[in-house]
């Protein structure tokens, strides 16, 4: 994904907006998660490891992010896209957005067509997943403690 220069640029341009959670075993770095800190939100996006460690992904991507939010009184934690396993850990499904520029017109048309179908499928998926939400609902709104 990202090269060394990417991380150097992040550290120089937005050092106060970065949170990196690292995991070590026997004084060796074995994994890390990259988060972006907003005014009222923490955004988790990328993680990596050198091997397959039981529950390391959940610890570095979710549990440590939750602890950071509690400690720093951050109201919202968006741990990243995808993953049915997030529901059982207290997260609800939410829409995310992205922007892309596709120069080739035929490719752009094909992607737009696919995204139209995909967005309908995602909408249905979110509705299905919300049925398993750990939060009470009232008038189609999810009640959460802030």
Model-derived regions: residue spans:
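A conserved beta-strand-loop-helix scaffold within acyl/acetyltransferase catalytic domains
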Residues: 1-53, 133-146
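Mixed-charge, polar/low-complexity N-terminal
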Residues: 3-5, 9-10, 16, 66, ...
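Acyl-donor binding region in acyl/amide transferases
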Residues: 41-105
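Terminal substrate-recognition subdomain of acyl/acetyltransferases
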Residues: 76, 82-146
